[in-house]
Amino acid sequence: MSQHSGGLSRRRFLAGCAGALALAPLLGHGLRAEAAAPGRLRVAQYKGGDRLLLEAAGLADTPYPIDWAEFASGNLMVEAMNGGSLDLAYGSEIPPLFGFIKGARIRVVGVIKGDVNEQTVLVPKDSPIRLIADLKGKRVGYVRATTTQYYLTKMLAEVGLSFADIEAINLTVPDGAAAFRTGQLDAWAIYGYSVPLAQSNAGARVLKRANGYLSGNYLFFASPEAIADPPRHAAIADFFVRLQKAFAWRQANPERYAAALAAEIGVPVEAVLALLRNESQVRRLVPVDDAAIRSQQDVADTFLKAGVIERPVDVRPLWDGSFAAALAG
């Protein structure tokens, strides 16, 4: 497998991107490593994430304090939670799976049904690459242990290719943005607000979207300690109810939400509205159920077949249904 994932070769690669973008730290901004105070929640988010949404919807006045920490990817959230620095986070099905395989102390407690059209493979606007098959031998950036590794694996397999047929380069989101912007990548598998940013700032073109390759399940995961602690458990339940209401507000007020998000992430409002109009499904937060567990099991089985993981994994012990009552409301 032709992959770069660290060490001298990766440092040399990134040297060509130096100064292009300010690289974000690997761990969350505002992260607190000490034990949480009673009822206090330490919550991870992405840039322009749940904090902004709750504030825009007028639902941020929680009766418990929240320490927000910003991360670029779900795998970093898993690492921070396993280190005792977070109570609650969310990401795709993939980061909790890899964390679980490595013994991380996390449990999946809720499921966001969300958009997959903003999960993409990007290429430069004037690139001759028109099909996934054209990626053979090309430099393709991705983020290991995230959706990008999963849907890129499936897209390549569909045209008879694998990671061994491309020059796959594992990069953090900020590093990938710098590499793509400076022409160090032929393609970039990426997600979220990085897509409109790359389109706006680097003239990116969407080669292929991940609709049809991903379930659209994004998993809230919590630390076992937070789940077992009554004040934090109650705070998480209340947080979930507020977020359900905020998602409904977002659906009813796309222009107001787009204006707030565009100002936060630094892209034109119309770019955000285009993403919202193109969403693959209405965003909502639902309880853990058997279908969601089966979906993550399918992900694990796909990675096993592709040789990404070495042995079969039963994901059921990763899941916790103790917030079902709060989420069912």
Regions inferred by a protein language model and the residue ranges of each:
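Short, glycine-/small- and polar/acidic-enriched structural segments
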Residues: 36-162, 169-170, 186-192, 207, ...
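Pocket-lining segment of extracytoplasmic ligand-binding domains
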Residues: 94, 175-263
